[in-house]
A protein has these predicted regions:
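C-terminal segment of classical bacterial N-terminal signal peptides
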Residues: 1-9
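Sequence/structural segment immediately N-terminal to covalent heme-attachment motifs in c-type
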Residues: 9-29, 90, 94-117, 132
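Hydrophobic alpha-helical segments typical of transmembrane helices
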Residues: 16, 45, 49, 62, ...
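Gly/Gly-Pro-rich "capping" loops immediately C-terminal to redox-active cysteine motifs
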Residues: 28-58, 64-70, 107, 119-145, ...
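Inter-heme linker and motif-flanking segments adjacent to c-type heme-binding CXXCH motifs
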Residues: 29-30, 84-97, 118-126, 144-152, ...
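C-terminal capping alpha-helices of c-type cytochrome domains
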Residues: 68-90, 134, 160-178
């Protein structure tokens, strides 16, 4: 049984978004470690990722079939909805020393050139500030291994220079941001 607050929140969710909430969480705040939170993400980025899943430029056993029946308008509505939600999940305890090392690595690799200061993102560049720690690690490893390549090679190129320690430190830093 849903609480009154949860029922009210669900009533405001676009019909097509209801299926998304099972993995991406209430209002787009994922509680699943390897699933990204969508709350507060750039609408353009969300739309492009949905389109990439649908058109086969990005592959995921769950997301590819989930996007199959979506129209352009559906994807735009979902992107708008999730971009307007507030990112609230902060459950990972970051290590301050690793955060410092992550800041240094982010500065060294010029992350802010694309992701902007404090990883706020812009347009088709994702906001990764406050993203799930495990998802950041997974994503960086996927780019490094070239298992994910729907970004014109930008992140693949950057991730190829990262060590396991660098990835861990960057994930601590990114997870520490709001």
């Amino acid at each position: 049984m849903l609480s009154l607050g949860a029922q009210t929140a669900m009533a405001q969710v676009p019909a097509k978004a209801a299926a998304c909430l099972a993995c991406h969480g209430e209002n787009g705040n994922s509680t699943m470690p390897n699933t990204p939170s969508l709350a507060g993400q750039n609408a353009r980025y969300i739309y492009l990722q949905l389109r990439d899943f649908q058109e086969g430029r990005r592959d995921n056993a769950m997301m590819t079939p989930m996007t199959a029946g979506l129209s352009k308008a559906d994807m735009q509505e979902l992107a708008k909805y999730f971009s307007e939600q507030k990112l609230t999940n902060k459950r990972f305890a970051t290590d301050p020393e690793k955060v410092k090392k992550g800041i240094a690595k982010a500065n060294e690799t010029l992350c802010a050139m694309c992701h902007q200061g404090e990883f706020k993102g812009q347009n088709e560049i994702p906001k990764v500030a406050g993203q799930n720690f495990d998802y950041v690690v997974k994503t960086l490893k996927d780019f490094k291994a070239k298992d994910r390549n729907n970004d014109a090679g930008n992140m693949t190129s950057v991730a190829s220079t990262l060590s396991e320690e660098d990835i861990d430190n960057l994930a601590h830093y990114i997870a520490s941001l709001n």
